[in-house]
């Protein structure tokens, strides 16, 4: 329903600046840097990109929109997770779905709002996950729906110092990780020696 100011021709529905400001307020209010102790962002080097066969991948649909540069962290090991970007970027194949993160294979770990981890397969409507931003802020968001389908996968392996990890994601250009210069990069364009943003913490618990 469009909301208009009395005596004004301006409708909130038609003002992207107002929506942007509103989302910024939500993000700032949700920043829990002084609350739950969560790991910070690091960089990792891609060591290999290989086919991962056919498997079940999970799209996590939130009850609110993501901003560019935001996503959730996921991976095959809880100590080394990669930042998966939300579907906020236009594509010639599908429309944007700014509430969605195509987070990868169902065995992957994700960080919840309370700092614990769950497998993607365990997530349910109403669960709270941690949303990470390239600017270092972290907020919570509620899951509205989980969409699991069989798709071809890519296994993207990486290392950061003594830590190694991998993430298995759908082989699709709309699935994006985030490069070390804070720009989204399609999973189908990632190559060996590229650098991506990850979260590293060997104290993660499940």
What positions do the PLM features span?
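Short, charged beta-turn/beta-strand-edge "cap" motif at the junction between a beta-strand
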Residues: 133-138, 198-206
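Short, conserved secondary-structure segments in the cores of folded domains
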Residues: 1, 116-119, 186
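Hydrophobic beta-strand signal
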Residues: 111, 129-131, 197
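Single conserved hydrophobic/aromatic residue that forms the stacking wall/gate
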Residues: 1-7, 11-12
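Short, well-ordered loop/turn sites that connect or cap secondary structure elements
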Residues: 104, 120-124, 189-191
């Amino acid at each position: 329903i469009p909301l208009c100011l009395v005596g004004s021709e301006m409708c909130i529905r038609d003002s992207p600046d107002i929506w942007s400001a509103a989302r910024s307020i939500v993000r700032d209010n949700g920043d829990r840097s002084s609350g739950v102790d969560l790991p910070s962002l690091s960089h990792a080097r891609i060591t290999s990109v290989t086919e991962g066969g056919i498997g079940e991948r999970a799209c996590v649909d939130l009850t609110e929109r993501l901003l560019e540069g935001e996503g959730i962290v996921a991976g095959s090991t809880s100590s080394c997770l990669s930042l998966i970007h939300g579907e906020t970027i236009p594509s010639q194949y599908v429309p944007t779905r700014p509430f969605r993160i195509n987070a990868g294979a169902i065995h992957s770990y994700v960080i919840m709002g309370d700092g614990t981890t769950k497998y993607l397969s365990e997530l349910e409507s109403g669960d709270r996950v941690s949303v990470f931003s390239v600017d270092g802020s972290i907020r919570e968001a509620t899951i509205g729906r989980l969409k699991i389908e069989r798709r071809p996968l890519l296994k993207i392996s990486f290392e950061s110092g003594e830590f190694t990890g991998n993430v298995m994601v759908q082989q699709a250009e709309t699935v994006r990780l985030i490069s070390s210069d804070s720009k989204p990069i399609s999973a189908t364009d990632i190559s060996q020696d590229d650098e991506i943003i990850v979260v590293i913490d060997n104290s993660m618990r499940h």
